[in-house]
């Protein structure tokens, strides 16, 4: 049996390098040099100290509250069935349920790190009173126990009002707005319940925050469907409408899911946009291409993980009925339930969930050089994984490694000024 790779050799526009997988350590090497465990021993030894072989024994540091199952849009590719999760979630969350979830989070989270409370739906701002009440309650309770806390929300922005803008500005919200591009692109798939386009309503709701964000961080998230992978055009349209941070999320399951023929197109479009933005960075400017800057930041931080996100570990999602799940995309799915107690995570069930999804236990992920960067991808989307989609991710990461080496050589201060030091 062939041992899984411990490093990945790659070339960049400035030279030859090796990525030591554990710890995402990038090592410059002479062209044509022979590599073995001896020459890379120092870096491999460091990787062994990171504990990547094990599932972490952690409690949630962040939770999302599924505020309501209702939504005022009827997006054709919605994974959540407009918040109803195929009938597994109904109604809206009560204040008591939300308070119990906040109490549980604060009871177990790490005091040395920031806790996060997110709001999801449906459309969470169909139930704005609860959001305002929870922010006040969580802020007060966190202050009582000396816990730093932050907030996030994913919204279509069509129901945002002045009081919501004030709340978002004042409480350092990470605001993610679901908007797919300019009006023609967006209105094709994101229609209201009367079948009308929603772009104008989205912009009316978010424009005040784009103009005056206060302490908020506003990001546009554009969903990509099969056959519509014009990333640069969408990016430029969203920049023209005032968004400064823009990310793209391809559909992998259900209506509009990318096919094997789409993935090479996605790769080319992603890299073409990133090449353009890299040129801006090298010229002394900045970029708002969130997927690209996230990859650069992860490489700079030496990020590597056997899990693609915090689902089931540092993150959990609470349904409208108060039950805890590993992921907001899995509400009502018994395989993702973290316990039967409405206010607590069962540590044993949590550990079983994580152990089963460790990337080194997954085929073919455990033989891939990108396994600690991709980490197997979203747990929910694992059934849609194909050779084509995996190759697309590897090609994207190879480009990001190249771009990272070029940027660190030409403009290392960009990382120190904006993204922390490795």
Features from the language model and the residues they span:
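Radical SAM/AdoMet-radical enzyme domain recognition
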Residues: 98, 102-118, 127-250
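Short glycine-enriched, charge-decorated loop/helix-capping segments at active-site entrances
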Residues: 84, 88-92, 188-196, 384
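N-terminal [4Fe-4S]-dependent radical SAM core
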Residues: 2-64
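Canonical Radical SAM [4Fe-4S] cluster-binding loop centered on the CxxxCxxC motif
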Residues: 58, 64-96
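Flexible mid-to-C-terminal extensions adjoining Fe-S/redox cofactors in radical SAM and related proteins
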Residues: 14, 331-422
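C-terminal accessory regions of radical SAM enzymes
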Residues: 19, 280-331, 361, 366-379
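Detector for the c-type heme attachment site
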Residues: 79-84, 215, 369-373, 383
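Radical SAM enzyme [4Fe-4S]-AdoMet core and its adjacent flexible, acidic
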Residues: 188-200, 207, 211-311, 334
